[in-house]
Amino acid sequence: MVIDSDKYFIHSNAWWWGVDYRIIRRDGAGIVGINFDNSMPETCYIEGLSVVEHERGKGVGRSLLELCELIARQEGKTFLSLSVEKDHPWLVEWYKRMGFFIYSIEDHTFLMIKCLK
């Protein structure tokens, strides 16, 4: 995996269930966590994506999401998935603009999916 190490710090952990990554912008503008769970061989789950408030609207979230896609593709995954709280409708719309769609509706969350192939 080739990622600009001057711009991002990447930490990975291997677990009995798979591997997870934490990707942090070195300038502190944002962080994302992704999981590769062996029980879901085609899917990369985005555990959380956060951008500090004063950096929002500057492409930080998009760049972190693009890194998730890059890693997922390199790992041979077919889908990216994530959950969005129902009380954050603006995030649902943002992820839709990034190519995700609502796959299922849970009690308090929307499960969203993006096809990578």
Give residue ranges: language-model regions.
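Conserved beta-strand-loop-alpha-helix junction that forms the acyl-donor binding cleft
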Residues: 81-92, 108-113
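Conserved GNAT acetyl-CoA-binding A-motif
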Residues: 72-83
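Short coil/turn motifs at secondary-structure junctions
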Residues: 37-39, 54, 87-89, 117
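Accessory recognition modules or surfaces
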Residues: 58, 62, 90, 114-117
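Terminal substrate-recognition subdomain of acyl/acetyltransferases
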Residues: 97, 101, 105-117
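Conserved acetyl-CoA-binding loop-helix of GNAT-fold acetyltransferases
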Residues: 51, 57-70, 97
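Conserved active-site alpha-helix within GNAT-family acetyltransferase domains
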Residues: 62, 74, 86-104
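Acetyl-CoA-dependent GNAT
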Residues: 1-47, 52, 71, 103-107
